Amino acid sequence: MYSGRSGAPPPAHSPYPNSYNHGPPGHSAGHNVPPPPPTQPVQFGHGAPQGYSFQYSNCTGKRKALLIGINYFGQRGQLRGCINDVKNMSTYLNQNFGYAREDMVILTDDQQNPMSQPTKANILRAMHWLVKDARPNDSLFFHYSGHGGQTKDLDGDEEDGNDEVIYPVDFRSAGHIVDDEMHRIMVKSLLPGVRLTAIFDSCHSGSALDLPYIYSTQGILKEPNLAKEAGQGLLSVVSAYARGDVSGMLSTVGGLIKKATSGDASHSKARQTKTSPADVIMWSGSKDNQTSQDATIAGEATGAMSWAFITALKKNPQQSYVQLLRSIRDELATKYSQKPQLSCSHPLNTDLLYVM
């Protein structure tokens, strides 16, 4: 359906300052540039089995982007700024990070082509396209601006009892898309060293990709108990997958299912950990119990999170993760009450240079 990725990876000295080890040295709005991400696998630690590791991406490989903006024209709860968010983000990614227009899929509800409408079927198809054939050090980008919400959690993996959802333009007939499904498509399949950057400018978006590590400007908010999960056999599936041991993975899954269906209470809610050997980062515009703002900034309707992310990076393109999180918070604080969050598929050294 969608064209493949075109062009060679950026050259060794990329003009894009947020690729690993690129850009003018020492430039960071008067400060030293934070250290780049390590190039070797990093152990999860925190009680995880020895050898259970993840890999940061240096973001020098191929680039693909999926951008979704839904204004819900003619529907109750119509929004004004979501399509503008996508236009602004696509221009920013193209001009500042080397994402080619032909390697972007844009789904907005002002387009005439039915395949470019943000329907549930088109969104799911595009999610599969985004992660297809991804390789280590590729940089994938996912952006959603539209309505978000919550629905009752059916698999027991949410602390508040609710799954986070997004609403396609045809949600009244086709239904919503649940965070579990987005995680399965866009996170679970990624190899070590593949970067997926996601931005959700929607209500109840704090855990929209079901990533287990959550950070705020104050530090870490949430992290999984890997020692407990390892004791339940929940990490062995991922460990086998990382080793390429498909038979081991299947036997582990089979064992978990057998235990879960045999009435063993301790395994009745056994589920695979949501950690990943890949490098998945998510910026969200609100915690799960907050609502995001559809705003007017400089005379243009826009989503507050999308605007703050672009504004903060334009002012200083070489910040650490925690510096960028604070910069986004400071931009939002001038106009809004919502608090930004950073979620990750692995434990994150927030003092490293943010690359994309």
Curated annotation (Swiss-Prot):
The active site is at residues 147, 203. Its EC number is 3.4.22.-. SUPFAM superfamilies: Caspase-like. It comes from the Eukaryota. One of its GO terms (cellular component) is cytoplasm. Keywords: Apoptosis, Hydrolase, Protease, Thiol protease, Zymogen. GO terms for biological process: apoptotic process; proteolysis. Pfam families: Peptidase_C14. Residues 1-47 are annotated as: Disordered. GO terms for molecular function: cysteine-type endopeptidase activity. The keyword Hydrolase applies. It is an enzyme of class 3 (hydrolase). PANTHER family: METACASPASE-1, METACASPASE-4. Belongs to the peptidase C14B family. Involved in cell death (apoptosis). This is Metacaspase-1. It comes from Ajellomyces capsulatus (strain NAm1 / WU24) (Darling's disease fungus). The lineage of its organism: Eukaryota, Fungi, Dikarya, Ascomycota, Pezizomycotina.
